Swiss-Prot record:
Disulfide bonds: none
Gene Ontology biological process terms in this record: nucleobase-containing small molecule interconversion; pantothenate biosynthetic process; pyrimidine nucleotide metabolic process
Function noted in UniProt: Catalyzes the condensation of pantoate with beta-alanine in an ATP-dependent reaction via a pantoyl-adenylate intermediate.
Domain of life: Bacteria
Alphabetized InterPro entries for the sequence: Cytidylate_kin (IPR003136), Cytidylate_kinase_dom (IPR011994), P-loop_NTPase (IPR027417), Pantoate_ligase (IPR003721), Pantoate_ligase/cytidylate_kin (IPR024894), Pantoate_ligase_C (IPR042176), Rossmann-like_a/b/a_fold (IPR014729)
Catalysed conversion reaction: (R)-pantoate + beta-alanine + ATP = (R)-pantothenate + AMP + diphosphate + H(+); CMP + ATP = CDP + ADP; dCMP + ATP = dCDP + ADP
Protein name: Bifunctional pantoate ligase/cytidylate kinase
Sorted UniProt keywords: ATP-binding, Cytoplasm, Kinase, Ligase, Multifunctional enzyme, Nucleotide-binding, Pantothenate biosynthesis, Transferase
Taxon lineage: Bacteria, Bacillati, Cyanobacteriota, Cyanophyceae, Synechococcales
Length: 510
């Protein structure tokens, strides 16, 4: 489409009314750098939407008039950078256009205190109110499908997510990791003010945060006083340095798997922020649900897209069931069962088709465990206390370092109750029976009557939901997704969106 520059709010309204396309919106305050380039190009490469970049230096975000006047303004270069990196439209309103002096109906918003009273909010009184006010105004003018923001301003990102939620705005927030310069400091429009010596100080600050992150991975704890002493020894002026829960911005607790170490320092007249995320282990996605709800297919695709390990716990129970049949062992005989559990090895291996094969005691049983014979007994075997204890322990060993997506019936309640994202995937019995029938047909399995399949699924549901040990139930904090009428890709995309909303992009880099 033709490149467009718009400067008036009435013009942007008219343009919006006449364009029949979804919009990716990238709000900026100008003086664009490589971080902005990445934001714009990420939006451009994500979809076929129209990319709109706004350039507006919002006076409500500044502490004083001097700070506003000194903010770098490079509009001609900003226009060039925006178009070169994928912008289709640039909106460059004046202050009078956004905050007309004769308009008494401007909506001035307040940022939520629970998110704005710590970190930058301690000393920048009213700053986040200004952010909310201008972004809300721009969103109502532009009505975008997606809003692209950087994780460098993590607190601002949380506050804007809250704004979208509380105002019930129909826009999806997409974030990108903090972008860093060649020497490791976060890219910022204010970096142009730094002298060589001041840049060395911010580099030392950012380096110490990374050192703290590395130490945390080993020791699972952090020593704030020690970090502050190191920074103070370099005569670095610390505005704040805090270790907090990344989403509530309250003091981090021992049981938190993920936390944020965030700080702000002053170098001369320039104030700069940086942060790192601290994780005891990589994230875990737990997907539970009844038979035929699509768990296996969905989980495999999610694992592939997010580069996570796929832990098919159901296959582990099926593999054990297969072995008991092969060895002609009566699972009701406790001693024989205990003996065989001592010598069981279940391993997952990738095959040449980029799929996952299941091995039990060196037997590849990927296809065999999906037979109707196995399906008819696996629920009974999985309800045996010794079997569940053994396999749950094996699953937890696999998940000690995280970085996986697991599916089953008790993942979020028993195996990984501390998973970052819990999904309860379900569908009607009719839908699940149709899927099972189609699946069996595609694998050239023996034809099975649809009515019989429904009865088998009902029976399996009852057994799974009523077993004494680890019954199939939805975890209190699980998000239920009903998949009737949804394509596999729609379900996968929804779960990945939920994952991206809960897990910072910076922690997903592998």
């Amino acid at each position: 489409m033709k490149k467009v520059i718009i400067r008036k709010t009435e013009e942007i309204k008219n343009w919006r009314r006449n364009i029949n396309s979804d919009i990716n919106f990238i709000p900026t305050m100008g003086n664009l750098h490589n971080g902005h380039k990445t934001l714009i190009s990420t939006a451009k490469n994500a979809n076929s939407n129209v990319n709109l970049v706004s350039i507006f230096v919002n006076p409500l975000q500044f502490d004083n008039k001097s700070d506003l006047e000194n903010y770098p303004k490079t509009i001609d270069n900003d226009i060039k950078i925006s178009f070169e990196n994928g912008a289709d439209v640039i909106f460059i309103p004046s202050t009078e256009e956004i905050y007309p002096s004769d308009n008494k109906n401007i909506t001035f918003l307040k940022a939520p205190l629970e998110l704005s009273s710590s970190l930058c909010g301690l000393n920048r009184i009213g700053h986040f109110d200004g952010v909310c006010t201008v972004v809300y105004k721009l969103l109502n003018l532009i009505k975008p499908k997606n809003l692209y923001l950087g994780e460098k301003d993590w607190q601002q990102l949380l506050i804007l997510k809250n704004l979208v939620l509380t105002k019930k705005l129909d826009v999806a927030i997409k974030s990108i990791p903090t972008q860093r310069d060649f020497d490791g400091i976060p890219l910022s429009s204010r970096n142009v003010h730094l002298s060589n010596n001041e840049r060395k100080l911010i580099r030392f600050f950012s380096h110490e945060l990374l050192v703290a992150k590395e130490n945390f991975q080993q020791e699972k704890k952090i020593n704030l006083k020690e970090i502050i002493q190191k920074l103070s020894a370099q005569k670095i002026s610390i505005e704040y340095l805090e270790h907090l829960h990344p989403y509530t911005l309250q003091e981090s607790k021992v049981e938190d798997n993920i936390s944020i170490l965030a700080g702000a320092i002053r170098c001369g007249e320039t104030r700069l922020i940086d942060h790192v995320f601290l994780m005891k282990r990589s994230p875990i996605i737990a997907i539970d649900g009844p038979a035929g709800s699509g768990k296996s297919t969905v989980t495999q695709l999610i694992a592939k897209k997010l580069k996570l390990l796929y832990l098919d716990t159901g296959a582990m129970y099926r593999a054990l069931s297969w072995l008991l049949i092969k060895e002609n062992i009566d699972y009701k005989e406790e001693k024989k069962l205990q003996n065989i559990l001592k010598d069981i090895s279940i391993v997952f291996k990738s095959n040449t088709n980029s799929q996952q094969d299941v091995f039990i005691n060196n037997y590849c049983v990927t296809e065999e465990i999906r037979s109707q014979e196995i399906s008819s007994i696996v629920s009974k075997i999985s309800s045996i206390k010794e079997v569940r204890e053994f396999l749950v322990e094996e699953q937890r060993k696999i998940g000690e370092s995280g970085g996986l997506v697991a599916e089953g019936r008790d993942i979020g309640t028993t195996v990984f109750p501390d998973a970052e994202l819990k999904i309860f995937l379900t569908a009607s019995i009719d839908e699940r029976a149709k899927r099972r029938k189609s699946d069996k047909k595609s694998k050239d399995s023996q034809e099975i009557d649809l009515h019989k399949l429904k009865e088998l699924i009902k029976k399996r549901d009852f057994e799974d939901s009523n077993r004494e040990i680890s019954p199939l139930i939805k975890a209190n904090d699980a998000i239920e997704i009903i998949t009737d009428g949804c394509s596999i890709n729609e379900v996968v995309d929804k779960i990945i969106d939920l994952y991206n909303d809960k897990i910072p992009k910076e922690t997903q880099i592998r």
